[in-house]
Amino acid sequence: MSPQLVGLLAAIFAGQARVLGMQAQNAHRAACGDSPAYTDEAFSIEAAHLDRLSVEASNAS
């Protein structure tokens, strides 16, 4: 695997970790009776970023 692909894979995993953190924060806030910290728009932004990274990784291989 090339260094470029390793970097892209790391960025994809970091994005997935951000999404999991966002989900956990929203679940915690819901359990406390608070409104979500992250909206659908925030998740859509992360999804679009992950999509761009996946296309870049596909083109790099």
For each feature predicted by the language model, list its residue ranges.
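Short, charge-rich amphipathic interface segments used for partner binding and complex assembly
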Residues: 21-61
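N-terminal acidic leader/helix
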Residues: 1-27
